[in-house]
Amino acid sequence: MKKFMYQLAILIAPFAFAMCSENGNIPVESNWELEYIYSNGSEMAPPEEHNATIAFLNDSQIAGDTGCNRFFGNFTATDNSLEFNNVGSTRMMCPQMQFENAFMSTIENTASYNISKDQLVLKDSLGNIIALLKKIEPVAQEN
């Protein structure tokens, strides 16, 4: 029995360490859809049929969609701190650019987060809630 437990521990250990390494508690390979942005004391919901999403990928990478343009970059998460960096995007012009600019500003201003059930809360450096996202199933990318 001891030998079995030892072998089991050896098999599980790499996965356990990989899950809690540099990505804090952000679940990699998770996808989130924006519900609200909070800016200057007001709440802004995505325009109808304007699904803004973000995916946390392996190797501390992100990919997302503003509802118009796609974006990509890196993230660093430790405990409850979260920082997005090297973020770039496509540059198409769309009718809802005000919303897209607000969403990208939210990404840039994120300093911390918490996850409760299937909701991701992004906060700025002062601890103010700046966005709420809900967990979703992965979206198939079009070629």
Question: Can you name each region flagged by the protein language model?
Answer:
Residues 8-16:
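Bacterial N-terminal signal peptides
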Residues 1-8:
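Bacterial N-terminal signal peptides that target proteins for export
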Residues 6, 19-143:
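Lipid interaction determinants
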